[in-house]
């Protein structure tokens, strides 16, 4: 386990373990976090000011193909945390990290799996019954079942300015370039978090 909570607190002073977090909640009733937002009319990744990852312009390098075989690298959790902080901003969101270290996979490996073996994007969108959070939770399950130890989870975020909406997608750490990408499970697009337009609320890995 690469992550020591005392060392982590030196980098991120607001770090809590689960017991410390639960101790700060009300003792006589649960703390309920409820989604009270409207979902966007189209996935936010399709906005003009969003940087999509272009796999045609960035083909899989030969070095990444070589890394697809053999033992995978073990990534310290602090690397993932620092990459998330760099991508989303320094704070004002909750980040739940369940593991002290992760197994390193690349964006090209994940894209190959999603493109060839996953069909979450073909599911029908049904308000309330199967909407954005359901899409992201289903894809998270499929990906984590296939790529053991992958730093792949779910993020909830919304706009910094009106009109207000909220959205849930997947979040992924690509170890080959030490970078965070969001993954829209409704259309399989990989994109960067737009810190100028959006604010993160919660991330769960």
Positions of predicted regions on the chain:
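A structural boundary/capping signal
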Residues: 2-205
